[in-house]
């Protein structure tokens, strides 16, 4: 069992110093049109390869400004909407004489340029990128042991960009990561 309660009584109207604390609000800023196509596939070959992938293509446009600001430009692209994105993976599994199953997998992901915001003062171009990952391992019904390399080329791809508190902050994908993954089913 648990329970909780809270009570508050606030008399002050100005509890933050507006000179140093930005006010955040969320509002519908614009109407937009989006024309797109997406798809995915999984294909199992006769020799135990699995090929899989997905893609999306987008054409976006801000069509009408709703917010009372000139910082939103009609005709510009939506934020975080790359013109295309795709990924493809190839995985091979084979039985071993020990009764275990070995596997190898490679994956490539690509993304086109995109923008970080629809507000012009906060809008930054996020360059397109491609990433590659690889893994190999052995498994059975009880456990999995796998070595992996994520971000094989060590690309510092920008995946998000904000101007929180009027300072640009860029988020990138994790750098090249090598690891060993062990999993045991109880």
Task: Provide a role label for each language-model segment.
Residues 8-9, 109-119, 138-186:
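C-terminal beta-signal and adjacent terminal beta-strands/loops
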Residues 85-92, 130-136, 169, 180-182:
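Feature captures outer-membrane beta-barrel proteins of Gram-negative bacteria and organelles
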Residues 33-35, 82-86, 128-132, 141, ...:
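Residues that define the transmembrane beta-barrel architecture of outer-membrane proteins
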Residues 44-46, 97, 127, 138, ...:
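Surface-exposed coil/turn segments at beta-strand junctions on protein surfaces, enriched
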Residues 16-25, 67-74, 121-126, 161-169:
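Flexible, surface-exposed loop regions and adjacent strand-edge segments
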Residues 12, 59-62, 154:
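Active-site micro-motifs of SAM-dependent methyltransferase domains
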Residues 1-7, 11:
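Single conserved hydrophobic/aromatic residue that forms the stacking wall/gate
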Residues 26-119, 183-185:
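Gram-negative outer-membrane beta-barrel transporters
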């Amino acid at each position: 069992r648990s329970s909780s309660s809270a009570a508050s009584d606030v008399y002050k109207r100005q509890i933050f110093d507006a000179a140093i604390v930005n006010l955040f609000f969320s509002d519908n800023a614009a109407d937009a049109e989006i024309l797109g196509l997406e798809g995915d596939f999984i294909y199992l070959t006769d020799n135990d390869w699995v090929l899989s992938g997905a893609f999306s293509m987008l054409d976006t446009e801000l069509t009408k400004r709703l917010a009372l600001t000139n910082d939103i430009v009609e005709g510009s692209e939506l934020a975080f909407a790359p013109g295309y994105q795709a990924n493809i993976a190839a995985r091979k599994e084979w039985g071993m004489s020990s009764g275990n199953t070995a596997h190898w997998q490679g994956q490539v992901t690509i993304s086109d340029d995109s923008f970080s915001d629809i507000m012009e003062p906060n809008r930054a171009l996020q360059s397109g990128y491609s990433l590659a990952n690889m893994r190999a391992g052995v498994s059975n019904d009880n456990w999995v042991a796998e070595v992996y390399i994520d971000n094989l080329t060590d690309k510092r791809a920008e995946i998000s960009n904000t101007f929180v508190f009027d300072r640009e902050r860029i988020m990138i994908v994790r750098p090249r990561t090598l690891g060993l993954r062990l999993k045991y089913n109880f």
